[in-house]
Swiss-Prot record:
S-S bonds: C48-C63, C55-C72, C62-C87, C74-C85
Propeptide residue range(s): 21-44
Main location: secreted
Protein name as it appears in the record: U3-lycotoxin-Ls1n
Location in the cell: Secreted
Organism (species): Lycosa singoriensis (Wolf spider)
Length: 115
């Protein structure tokens, strides 16, 4: 019986040690991947077109707002023949961002009350 107990403790110890090493390896890989994604995002962010600026040269270059990417909207100004394109945020996305911000504030208040 002592042998079975000793063998069980040894098995549990080895299992926990091996799983801890595997988790460390995964954490390191995740950190490296996250850093590379952040670097790529920073590099990409330098090339984006700000809101209300001309995006006719590249219609997919609009910057991101807090939650959503702006959309290149083209129109013909009154009395003009030239098409004008600017990066704009659609109204429904603007309202969704505003609602998400209010929900975040409300969640903070609830945490403050009950946390």
């Amino acid at each position: 019986m002592k042998f079975v107990l000793l063998f069980g403790v040894l098995l549990v110890t080895l299992f926990s040690y091996s799983s801890a090493e595997m988790l460390d390896d995964f954490d390191q890989a995740d950190e490296d991947e996250l850093l590379s994604l952040i670097e790529k995002e920073e590099a990409r962010a330098k090339e984006c077109t700000p809101r209300f600026y001309d995006c006719s040269h590249d219609r997919h270059s609009c910057c991101r707002s807090e939650l959503f990417k702006d959309v290149c909207t083209c129109f013909y100004p009154e009395g003009g023949d030239n098409e004008v394109c600017t990066c704009q945020q659609p109204k429904h996305l603007k309202y969704m961002e505003k609602a998400a911000g209010e929900a975040k504030k409300f969640g903070g208040k609830i945490k403050k009350w009950f946390g």
